[in-house]
């Protein structure tokens, strides 16, 4: 009946995802994913430190005497305008670098999982898709800060964060298979939105599975680790788990949408 069919499908996704994710493929995909986060976080810290230095240089300590001096006020305003211009340039530069890292490393990640050719044409198309896709979602997140009240903004951000993750996976799966931007957006969103009911149980299973692994594996390891090593273990555990999650969802999408990985 329905229950036996449901159990069969879920076990099918799980078994096939574990069978497909060989040790070599897991290591290569994990390495590509880890490199993205390494570069993204490292450059983020570099730009953040750069802005901290600029703020210190351009905006001196301000006291009440500053507001009694017209020249001092003009100087502060000019410094603030300069700082805003620098902030804009740094933000745009970091966003473009982030898209490049996304195209190079996330593109490599999906090509590894789906056994697709990793070529310059593929990376360039991945870059243009990501520039459009991440640009749209960045605009949505920024716009939300101005459109929603403080009392609901956290919930709205969480909702949009979920929608971003939920729609991104099918979009990039379709793109990696076809290497066509327009088709990836159309078909990927169709799978994500039109077939959202297919994702609900797998999402619940992923959460339960993650909690179970944390309790049975991660927490015991962390109790034996010390200092920064504990952070490294947590990071690698999370990245490896997320690699499996995407293979698991890829198996589910392959079943319902007919997308073959092999």
Which functions belong to the PLM regions below?
Residues 40-56, 142-145, 212-224:
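Juxtamembrane "helix exit" motif at the C-terminal ends of alpha-helical transmembrane segments
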Residues 22, 47-76, 121-153:
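Long, highly hydrophobic alpha-helical transmembrane signal-anchor segments
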Residues 84-112, 133, 137-183, 224-261:
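Selective recognition of hydrophobic, aromatic-rich stretches within alpha-helical transmembrane segments
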Residues 21, 25, 75, 79-83, ...:
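Membrane-helix interfacial "entry" motifs
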């Amino acid at each position: 009946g329905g229950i036996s069919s449901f159990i069969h499908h879920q076990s099918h996704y799980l078994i096939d995802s574990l069978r497909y994710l060989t040790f070599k493929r897991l290591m290569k995909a994990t390495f590509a994913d880890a490199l993205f986060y390494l570069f993204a976080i490292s450059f983020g810290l570099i730009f953040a430190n750069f802005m901290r230095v600029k703020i210190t240089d351009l905006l001196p300590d301000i006291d009440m005497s500053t507001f009694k001096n017209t020249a001092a006020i003009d100087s502060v305003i000019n410094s603030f305008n300069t700082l805003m211009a620098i902030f804009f340039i740094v933000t745009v530069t970091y966003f473009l670098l982030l898209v490049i890292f996304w195209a190079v490393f996330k593109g490599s990640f999906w090509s590894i999982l789906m056994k697709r050719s990793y070529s310059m044409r593929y990376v360039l198309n991945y870059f243009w898709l990501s520039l459009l896709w991440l640009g749209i979602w960045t605009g949505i997140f920024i716009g939300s800060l101005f459109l929603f009240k403080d009392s609901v903004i956290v919930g709205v951000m969480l909702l949009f964060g979920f929608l971003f993750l939920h729609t991104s996976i099918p979009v990039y799966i379709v793109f990696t298979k076809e290497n066509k931007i327009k088709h990836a957006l159309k078909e990927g969103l169709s799978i994500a939105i039109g077939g959202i009911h297919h994702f609900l149980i797998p999402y619940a299973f992923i959460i339960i599975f993650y909690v179970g692994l944390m309790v049975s594996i991660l927490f015991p390891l962390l109790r034996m680790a010390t200092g920064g090593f504990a952070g490294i273990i947590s990071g690698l555990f999370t990245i490896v788990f997320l690699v499996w999650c995407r293979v698991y969802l890829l198996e589910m999408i392959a079943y319902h949408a007919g997308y073959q990985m092999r």
